[in-house]
Amino acid sequence: MSILLPNMAEFDTISELEEEEEAATSSSSPSSSPSSSSSSSVSGPDEDEEDEEEEEEEDEEEEDEEEEEEEVPPPPRVVSEEHLRRYAPDPVLVRGAGHITVFGLSNKFDTEFPSVLTGKVAPEEFKTSIGRVNSCLKKALPVNVKWLLCGCLCCCCTLGCSLWPVICLNKRTRRSIQKLLEWENNRLYHKLALHWKLTKRKCETSNMMEYVILIEFLPKYPIFRPD
């Protein structure tokens, strides 16, 4: 027993040391908790400030991107059609040369080749196109004249209603000439940068209106010009 007592004493001292360590740790834990709370309280505003700075930087980056998107380079300069037409030559008028005119539409157009069209279109093609228009008028105008005479004779009895047939016939004649000119344009003249159309103009000798053939010069677009 004398031998075991020292060993038991050692065991007692070890257990006492363990109890003292546990007491020390328990006493240190409350003291450390305020420090941690204070550190968290101190670190909290710093983190908020950092978050605000990051948000401001993101907002600035978004604004910079929007400004870059808004500052798009201007589109390439394009020449407008009105600008090209302004510098085009004046159109050519082909007036009526017949001895009968019904509601401003003569029974014949002048077949003389205008000098302005020299180098633009062949005189033979010009005379052929005018000949087609004159042949259309030659067929339609005599019928219109007959209906006009009948309408004038019966005008008093019908209160002017007898003039409606000749008005409709004259409108149909104009439409047939317009279709003929469109066919001529698609066939030849658009390729030569010309455009034929039937339009109204004042007479040279009076203030009355008459139908003439207007030959316009189409603008040539600069297709080889860089953007």
Swiss-Prot record:
Composition skew (Low complexity), residue ranges: 24-44
UniProt KW keywords: Cell membrane, Coiled coil, Cytoplasmic vesicle, Lipoprotein, Membrane, Palmitate
Modifications after synthesis and translation: Palmitoylated.
Acidic residues: bias regions: 13-23, 45-72
Tissue expression pattern: Expressed moderately in the brain.
Span list, region Disordered: 1-84
Principal localisation: membrane
Localization per Swiss-Prot or TrEMBL: Cell membrane; Cytoplasmic vesicle
Pfam families listed in its UniProt record: Erf4 (PF10256)
GO cellular component, one term: plasma membrane
Coiled-coil region(s): 46-73
Family membership noted in the UniProt record: Belongs to the CHIC family.
Database matches in PANTHER family: CYSTEINE-RICH HYDROPHOBIC DOMAIN PROTEIN BRAIN X-LINKED PROTEIN, CYSTEINE-RICH HYDROPHOBIC DOMAIN-CONTAINING PROTEIN 1
Name of the protein in question: Cysteine-rich hydrophobic domain-containing protein 1
Species of origin: Mus musculus
Gene: Chic1
